[in-house]
Amino acid sequence: MRLWHDERVRTPDFDRLYADDPDPWKVASSWYERRKIAIVLASLRRPRYRSAWDAGCGTGELVAALAERVDGILATDASRAAVALATTRLADTPHVEVAHSPLPQRPDGLAQAPDLVVVSEVLYYLDADDRAATYALVDEIAAPAADLVLVNWGPHPDDAHVSGLEAFNEASAALAERGWGRVVTHADVEFLLGVFSRDVPDDVGGRDTANGDDADHLPTSPEETR
């Protein structure tokens, strides 16, 4: 099933998707999603964060897990249907605010610069201009020592502009140009995860990160993850 509701801008109609199924990716039940959330949590460098922005919250399952380690979270999504579902899911979590805000739009509701930004399985649904604007937006609004978590399903999702691998490698390069280094890398046959920060030690485990000695090799094709 194709989900483009505007062939000119090629924007997926996620509201229609959620209307057919309130959990179309089985986020609340699938092992892939539960495992991914656990790995995201394990990859966070700090035990607690002051302020977070989840820039594609979906139905709010990851936000619910993050809420145990963040003082205040703004969760946004491009789909009004997803926002409604997430609002219900997170109703008993008073330090979480859910709002409609599509990338690369600057979100309202950020009381302070977030020290954690999460962009999970969103980038490949944006066109090239919107992806570039998203990288610039994150660089602009994140706190100086913020952590940015990027997660992409590795293959090419239906109705996506690029594959997860392509989006991840593009984002890594764009962030590096802005002074963000990768401090955590996870790559397997299902998804890619990276934690990026401008607060990167010059020497990590004997590697000179300041001079580009990066031992964290990411696959350049899906076959490399097998």
Say what each PLM segment does.
Residues 1-55, 59-110, 126-140, 146-226:
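Class I (Rossmann-like) S-adenosyl-L-methionine-dependent methyltransferase catalytic domain
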Residues 118:
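A conserved beta-strand element that flanks and buttresses the S-adenosyl-L-methionine
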Residues 122:
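Hydrophobic adenine-recognition pocket in adenosine-nucleotide-binding enzymes
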